[in-house]
Amino acid sequence: MGEKLDKDSILYKKRHSIAHVMAEAVLELFPNTKIAIGPPIKDGFYYDFDFEKHISEDDLLLIEHKMREILKTGSPFIREVITREQALVLFKDEPYKIDLIQNFDVTDEITIYKSHKFTDLCRGPHVDNMNKLDPKAFKLTSIAGAYWRGDERNKMLSRIYGTLWNNEKDLKAYLKLQEEIKKRDHRKLGRELNLFSVHDEIGPGLIFFHPHGARIRALIENFWREEHFKNGYDILFTPHIGKSWLWETSGHLDFYKESMFEKIEMDRSDYYVKPMNCPFHIAIYNTDKHSYRDLPFRWAELGTVYRYEKIGAIHGTMRVRGFTQDDAHIICTYEQVNFEVREVLRFAIDMWNKFGFTNLKAYLSTKPEKAVGDDDDWQMAVKVLEKALIDFNIDFDIDEGGGAFYGPKIDLKIIDSLGRAWQMSTIQFDFNLPVRFKMTYTAEDGKEKRPFMIHRALLGSIERFFGILVEHYGGAFPVWLAPLQVVIIPVNSIVEEYALEVLSRFQNEGIRIKFDNYCNMRMNAKIRQYQSKKVPYMFIIGEREVVEGKISIRTRTNEQINGLELKEALEFVKLKISNKEIL
């Protein structure tokens, strides 16, 4: 769920059209190449090719030059409807096109687009002619491998990515942003700041947190727990595996098996590592009988789950195979639904603000064609979700029919410092699992009723959120999240006794502080070193500071604060931490 590509937008049409121009250029330069597919995507386009010989990013400029030659012709993009038989003849030498055609439904209309010397199997839409494409407003950006149809059992193709904008100015702005994104790439900063690593020889998509990264993760998780206790939640811990009957009852084996790891056979039973926490929370609920007086239950867990992601989809900490889900389930009565949804939304907004995200975007997904549950419950749930968004003045789009088959939901996106939207929090009604697991409570009239169940995530997964935080702050975390908050840098060995006194005082107050008494490096070099490691504060201690009992502070942003009393310096740092200030 999220922003959809607008097929009627001029940029969509331009990007689709330039993908065809790129394909023609490639075929002219590399005649024996086979073509696959080439759609527009967010911010650009790509085309998949099966090259006879290996090409590299060094060839991109050559392809760009040929594309500009083709654009000069001003050729039109002409749409034609053809029969299945005509299509099979037309693309007889293109195996990937034949594969597509053979998998079309017999009722599908087959269309092609012709432009200059190129013809492609395509639904469109496109611009009228090549004069609408600014030759200075596009750039080919990279080459990557991509399996045909996204299936690892198929051949690996070469995917050429590009970007196109309405004009050169917009292109330059986009490319500048991409350079900043590269600098902030959490995989790059993860290595440079020694935060985490991945080891494919041990297992792809599995994250190893190093001491500094683990410190940040622990701070996030501790804060998460504290906030949940403050907001009336109880914390659960559940197992990592469960017998197959559990996943059969939940429906995971019917509808989600492709994303689950293979079964584990032991003790004459089949087990699966859990892809989700929900059935375990329900098992706890069903341990006892409940009255309406017991509800609501607000149960949260940082539960590690395992999902089989294809190798090509794995990406740093953002897309992994084992991750810790920030999960909660609210089990309540009909009368409590409105309050509980409002409270979840308030909690989500408050949580994001404290991590430095104040710009949110929401999507409300409503009932799809095929759905379970009572119509009245669906209507009520949608109204409750919509009212909560309106009451909190959150900008939202409605995705008609975009809900899960088991209930409507709100998806919340945060906007990071680079203007990118990240899907994070979800508030999801579930009209399915309470029925499958026969969840009940005794109502005020003594009758057994089905409770309402709301799935809720705030951070999504800890690993993914960690990666987003790294990129949002460029590794320069707020002081409260910085793995190392202060470094003491002595001017010489004479001041060591006072420096150790400062170290002890700050350590006793819980400040994460280090004393760097390594002598074989100049002080300015040390300052630069710790600034590059994104340490918030460097305490510079010389003989003057010793005599006056004071501290001079250099920040990672190169601000200088001189002559603070020891107590003042301590209060200064503690205030930055308690206020969760961004340096």
Curated annotation (Swiss-Prot):
Cofactor: Zn(2+)
Catalytic activity: tRNA(Thr) + L-threonine + ATP = L-threonyl-tRNA(Thr) + AMP + diphosphate + H(+)
Domain of life: Bacteria
EC number, UniProt record: 6.1.1.3
Binding site for Zn(2+): C278, H329, H455
Localisation: Cytoplasm
Keyword tRNA-binding: yes
CDD domains listed in its UniProt record: ThrRS_anticodon, ThrRS_core
Coiled coil: none
GO CC terms, sorted: cytoplasm
GO MF entry, a single one: tRNA binding
Annotated segments matching region Catalytic: 185-478
PROSITE patterns on file: AA_TRNA_LIGASE_II
Family, per entry: Belongs to the class-II aminoacyl-tRNA synthetase family.
Function: Catalyzes the attachment of threonine to tRNA(Thr) in a two-step reaction: L-threonine is first activated by ATP to form Thr-AMP and then transferred to the acceptor end of tRNA(Thr). Also edits incorrectly charged L-seryl-tRNA(Thr).
Record NCBIfam families: thrS
Assembly and interaction partners: Homodimer.
Protein's recorded name: Threonine--tRNA ligase
Species for this entry: Borrelia duttonii (strain Ly)
Lineage: Bacteria, Pseudomonadati, Spirochaetota, Spirochaetia, Spirochaetales
